[in-house]
Amino acid sequence: MSKQSPTRKLRQTVYDASLKVMFTLRPERIHGLMNKALGVVDGVAPLNRTMEKIIAVHDDSLSQEVFGVTFPRPLGLAAGFDKNASMADAWGAVGFGYAELGTVTASPQPGNPTPRLFRLPADKAILNRMGFNNLGAAEVATNLSNRKSTDVIGINIGKTKVVPAEHAVDDYRRSASLLGDLADYLVVNVSSPNTPGLRDLQAVESLRPILAAVQESTTVPVLVKIAPDLSDEDIDAVADLAVELKLAGIVATNTTISREGLNTPAGEVEAMGAGGISGAPVAARSLEVLKRLYARVGKEMVLISVGGISTPEQAWERITSGATLLQGYTPFIYGGPDWIRDIHLGIAKQLKAHGLRNIADAVGSELEWKN
């Protein structure tokens, strides 16, 4: 990356100092404070527009049409932050090209008992066992219907915890029916480790009727989100099913239940308990899964890569390895809006360095990063 400007350095210094203060608070308390701040951006249109002009990267080379939707920039907010679409109009203002909201379940639910969110600063990671806490599809639909912006929005839907697996199809269908027309795309989440039995629904025989029901319930593109902990054979099976059902794409990957290779002392991690880890520790496996998916089905559907994309170099590698779109959550917590800006500026610079007119030309190209 080019040398940082004094303004950029100042912004990052201020954010880093703020982060140190915030990290003295409980993680969910920080999340609540960030929600309130973003809620102001969401609700004040002039502020929203001003921030978008200042913070977001505006470069025609970053814009692309994906499954019939125009994405102005490739990096989006990953699901898990804006669970209730309460800040749906704020994400473009902080620089994202789109946002995936949720996870939303058909019925409201409180999620798992607290504490359920933990920081691993030594790993630039977060461990969570939130358990799909949300207001339910009907309430989220109301929030979405009150949106003022035309920013691209995806909705991530999951299974209500109390609904048994044998009734999962109807549960997902209900969410899709309520939310589908209010989103630009839907993602079927069967890969969170924090709802008992949910990951079992990734098995093809369980997944097929769920995906088919969601497709029947909406006219918007449908994608499926998978776990990094699937075996290579299971990844292939889900990919083949996605092609068979003509899904719009695959989001890869969710959080990992692996605890290997962490810098955080094992005793501290064990004390945190169960949950999925996001951020830097999942980066290598997420890249592996992306490459496997692209080799198998990349020419037939859109691949959205998420998991530990912390630097512009990593973002470029995901794109050149087959990702049409990118997502992040944990790096946003650690890096703030300038992380989003750096990613987009880095990608635009690489496109220019390689003589490419549009990001679509770089997808799957295997082009190296140019310094």
UniProtKB/Swiss-Prot annotation:
SUPFAM superfamilies from the UniProt entry: FMN-linked oxidoreductases (SSF51395)
Free-text comment on the cofactor: Binds 1 FMN per subunit.
Regions that span the bilayer: none
Organism domain of life: Bacteria
A Pfam family hit: DHO_dh
Reaction catalysed by this enzyme: (S)-dihydroorotate + a quinone = orotate + a quinol
Membrane topology label: Peripheral membrane protein
EC number annotated for this UniProt entry: 1.3.5.2
Residues annotated as binding substrate: 83, 128-132, 189, 194, 254-255
Binding, FMN: 79-83, 103, 156, 189, 225, 253, 279, 308, 329-330
One example of a Gene Ontology biological process annotation: 'de novo' pyrimidine nucleobase biosynthetic process
Primary location group: membrane
Known role: Catalyzes the conversion of dihydroorotate to orotate with quinone as electron acceptor.
Family classification: Belongs to the dihydroorotate dehydrogenase family. Type 2 subfamily.
The protein, known as: Dihydroorotate dehydrogenase (quinone)
Organism: Corynebacterium glutamicum (strain R)
